[in-house]
Amino acid sequence: MTSGSPARAALIALDWGTSSLRAYRLDGAGRTLDTRHLPWGIMRLPQPLQDGAATASTQSGFELAFEQACGDWLRAEPALPVIACGMVGSAQGWQEAAYLDVPVDLPRIGTLLTRIDRAGATPVHIVPGLIQRHGLPNVMRGEETQVFGVLFDQAGGGADDVLIGLPGTHSKWVTARRGRVTHFDTFMTGEVYAALRGHTILGRTMSEAP
């Protein structure tokens, strides 16, 4: 899916997860000018052809997916910075971006991006995920950018402590204080429900969502 605007952009942002790739062309105020949604998650990448046959080069697969997502944007505006978040920075991704330990000040994330150099082409910078080592070990990749957005919107609102709910297959509840992530928990409710619905006798009694 794509939508478009000829307005001048300031940034390309990628939300690159396990099952899909979302690309956003943003202006200087953070407004969305263009969006694209492709089925190329890190576990399902396009395969380059070599002598008419598909090859198994993972790096080439990432390059192909990246080109489909925003190659024309960069040809039109080659100086645009590109920032990516999500599982693209995992050990199975394009390049691993080290986790930052919680508690952490969110502005610090922007100073520790992992750079992917692309043979003279526009580099890609990957946002680090967060890891919580105390208590039950916990990690996140991609959700930290959503937390950043919530806290940015809350700036000046007078609330010191914020509890943020992030629904999904692996839902998260994040506690933040004055721009600092102090704790988060992950719940596998969505995945457990999907497993029950698809692989147990209980699933036969579950109706479709309205």
PLM segments and residue spans:
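Short glycine-aspartate micro-motif
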Residues: 11-15, 81-83, 162-166
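Short acidic-glycine loop/turn motifs at beta-strand connectors
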Residues: 27-31, 120, 175-180
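Solvent-exposed alpha-helices and their adjacent loops that cap or buttress functional pockets
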Residues: 2-6, 75, 117-119, 153-158, ...
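Conserved active-site "lid/cap" helical segment
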Residues: 52-77
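Glycine-rich phosphate-binding loop plus the immediately following alpha-helix
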Residues: 43-45, 131-158, 162-163, 167-210
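Gly/Ser/Thr-rich loops at beta-strand to alpha-helix junctions
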Residues: 17-22, 38, 87-91, 166-172
